[in-house]
């Protein structure tokens, strides 16, 4: 799974996910399913934000990469991917500026057009179940919830999906592609049900005699399909801005 993640996702996404896991004392090399889940969630958050701007009349517009509109304001503030201290600093700044209610938990995005925080969910389970879990945890009607699944389903607060249909379709297509690539490598079942995968693995290992030639790592080969999974949503200017904002690494 770790090899798949590093081959499938943009290096910046991988770096942010590693940083987030290490902040909580987790190892991406051991908790590989969580590593994949965090990368997927980060990518969905970035895709949710990219190409969406607010013009001088405070109207929401969509601008594809390469258009000369550098002065436009991004519609969404990305909070996910920052360390906890910086994330709360951003949240507090938004609340002080806009007057919106401060959330109890760190949200993923802030929508400057609708003036609300957004919690993004990506689930391997049924969307309604995951939505209710999110709502029960957040316990706030002020934070908007939007759930996506790997099967193309989605659910949002009051059926308000925020984005246009085409933008949401890009996210759904990407999630479906990730699922297909995992399945083709035999990784999907363990990603959906890690406990069952662990139990089955132990059972299988017990039936095997000790052998020095047993494989211990996932294949490093990249499938032809993965080579086409370039993250088109990540234009160079956006990548540079995000890297400068999120990753404050000193040059060695």
UniProtKB/Swiss-Prot annotation:
Q: Which Gene3D superfamilies match?
A: Influenza RNA-dependent RNA polymerase subunit PA, endonuclease domain (3.40.91.90)
* Keywords of this entry: Decay of host mRNAs by virus, Eukaryotic host gene expression shutoff by virus, Host cytoplasm, Host gene expression shutoff by virus, Host mRNA suppression by virus, Host nucleus, Host-virus interaction
Please list the residues that make up the active site. Answer: 80, 108
Main localization of the protein? host cell
The places in or outside the cell where this protein is found are:
Host cytoplasm; Host nucleus
Q: Which molecular function term from Gene Ontology is one that the record holds?
A: RNA binding
Which residues of this protein are annotated with the site description Important for efficient shutoff activity? 202-203, 206
Which residues carry the site feature described as Important for efficient shutoff activity and nuclear localization? 195, 198-199
Which Gene Ontology BP terms does the record give? viral RNA genome replication; viral translational frameshifting
Q: Report whether NAD shows up as a keyword of the record.
A: no
The Swiss-Prot or TrEMBL note on domains reads: The probable endonuclease active site in the N-terminus and the basic amino acid cluster in the C-terminus are important for the shutoff activity. The C-terminus acts as a nuclear localization signal. The C-terminus is recruited to host protein complexes involved in nuclear Pol II RNA processing.
> Which protein family is it in?
Belongs to the influenza viruses PA-X family.
Q: What does this protein do?
A: Plays a major role in the shutoff of the host protein expression by cleaving mRNAs probably via an endonuclease activity. This host shutoff allows the virus to escape from the host antiviral response. Hijacks host RNA splicing machinery to selectively target host RNAs containing introns for destruction. This may explain the preferential degradation of RNAs that have undergone co- or post-transcriptional processing.
* Protein name per Swiss-Prot or TrEMBL: Protein PA-X
Q: Which organism is it from?
A: Influenza A virus (strain A/Chicken/Hong Kong/YU22/2002 H5N1 genotype Z)
Organism ancestry: Viruses, Riboviria, Orthornavirae, Negarnaviricota, Polyploviricotina
Query: What's the name of its gene?
Result: PA
